[in-house]
C-alpha cells in the first residue's frame, strides 16, 4: 500500500484547465521522478502494491495511479464518488483525471462501517483489520480528506502520522493545552543576550497572547480549503 503519490512527472497531462492555470500564473513545476519509479529502483515490485490511498485528490498528492498495475486499487475518502465523478475529460473544467481509476477498483472508505471506530476524536478505519494502519477522517481541506496512523512499534505502541493536508504549518496545532508555550526553556537557545525568558518572548508575539492556543488558524481565503471551519475542526481533533 502507498499513501499519496506526490506530483506526477508529466504534470502537463493533468486536466487542461488546471495546466492552463499553472502556466498562466507564472509558476514552474519540475518533477524528476515519481513514486512508482522510486519503488522499482529500490527493488519493490509494483505488482505487490495492493492499493494507492489518496489523502485527497489535489495534484500534489494524487500523482498518476496509472503508473501502477490495474491490480492496484485506488482508495478515496467519503463523498469522492458523489462530488468528483464524473471528472475530466467528461467534465472539461474538472481538475481530476478519470484515467486515475480507469481499469482498477475505486474504493471509497466508509468510516461508519464494520471497520469503523474512534481514535481520539477522529472517525477512524482499521485498514488491514489488525491495528497496523488506520485511516482518519479529517475533512475540510478537500472532499473526503483523510489522514492516517501507521504503526511503527507494537510494544510500546508508537505510530507515525501521515497528515496529508490536515494542516499546512505547525503553528496551526501548536501550542496547545497539551503542549503549551513553556515559561522557561532549558537550555536557553538565546544564551545571555536577553534578560526575558524565551517563553515570554514567544508569548509576546503570539496573536492572542495565549500560551495554550495555536499561533494560526486555517486561512479563509478562497481556494485554499473546501471548508475552512471544518478544516479547523479537524486540526482541533489532531491537537
From Swiss-Prot:
Gene expressing this chain: MBL2
UniProt-annotated binding residues for Zn(2+) 2: 60-61, 165
Amino-acid positions noted as binding Zn(2+) 1 in the UniProt annotation, renumbered to this chain: 56, 58, 141, 165
Enzyme class: hydrolase
Additional detail: Fusarium verticillioides possesses 2 unlinked loci, FDB1 and FDB2, necessary for detoxification of antimicrobial compounds produced by maize, including 2-benzoxazolinone (BOA). The FDB2 cluster arose as a duplication of the FDB1 cluster with rearrangement and expansion by incorporating additional genes.
Mutant lacking the gene: phenotype: Does not affect tolerance to 2-benzoxazolinone (BOA).
Single Gene Ontology MF annotation: hydrolase activity
EC number of this enzyme: 3.1.1.-
Stated induction or repression of this protein's expression: Expression is induced in response to 2-benzoxasolinone (BOA) exposure.
Organism: Gibberella moniliformis (strain M3125 / FGSC 7600)
Gene3D superfamilies hit by this protein: Ribonuclease Z/Hydroxyacylglutathione hydrolase-like (3.60.15.10)
Described purpose of this protein according to its UniProt entry: Gamma-lactamase; part of the Fusarium detoxification of benzoxazolinone cluster 2 (FDB2) involved in the degradation of benzoxazolinones produced by the host plant. Maize, wheat, and rye produce the 2 benzoxazinone phytoanticipins 2,4-dihy-droxy-7-methoxy-1,4-benzoxazin-3-one (DIMBOA) and 2,4-dihydroxy-1,4-benzoxazin-3-one (DIBOA) that, due to their inherent instability once released, spontaneously degrade to the more stable corresponding benzoxazolinones, 6-methoxy-2-benzoxazolinone (MBOA) and 2-benzoxazolinone (BOA), respectively.
Gene Ontology terms: biological process: secondary metabolite biosynthetic process
Entry annotated with the keyword Hydrolase: yes
Membership in a protein family: Belongs to the metallo-beta-lactamase superfamily.
Keywords in alphabetical order: Hydrolase, Metal-binding, Zinc
Superkingdom of the organism of origin: Eukaryota
Protein name listed in UniProt: Gamma-lactamase MBL2
